[in-house]
Amino acid sequence: MKRVIYVFALLIICETCFSQNKLQDGVYLVDRSAANSIAPGKTNKAIVKFNPFFFEGDPDTYKPLVVFTDDFVPFKLAAAPVIQHQNGSEGQVLVHLTDSAAQKLGEFTAKNRMSEVVVVIDNQAIAVYKVFDPVSSALIKITRCTGSACSLISRQLKNSLKI
């Protein structure tokens, strides 16, 4: 009887884990509308939590974000991510997108001026930016980081994108 209960519990856990949609790594538009809850019938939105390695200040201020999933820019890298170290322990992660991904990012940012976008890596938000001008370069900074966070993101990009 115990085995049946354990098997049943394991099945429920597996069902829960695999039923959650995993977002592709990329740039997504943030939904800041007043009613940004996800309705049961809506499939073009998802909730993204922040990666705790990228908290600056009070972690309670980092609420989950609602993002649109129907129009986004997937990360298609032309080369391995680069960690550029700056003052002290702070650095930034730079990625070189393929030509098609860079073109899509330019169109995406032109269409979504004055809106917020979020960089999602491994189904977690690592940075939120407000779009003022369209991005015109294939080499972009995706986040600032300190400590081991830069290495973590670089490793996740290399592993998930198989570059």
Please report, for each region that a protein language model flagged, where it lies by residue:
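Bacterial Sec-dependent N-terminal signal peptides
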Residues: 1-22
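Structural signature of multi-pass, alpha-helical inner-membrane proteins
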Residues: 18-163
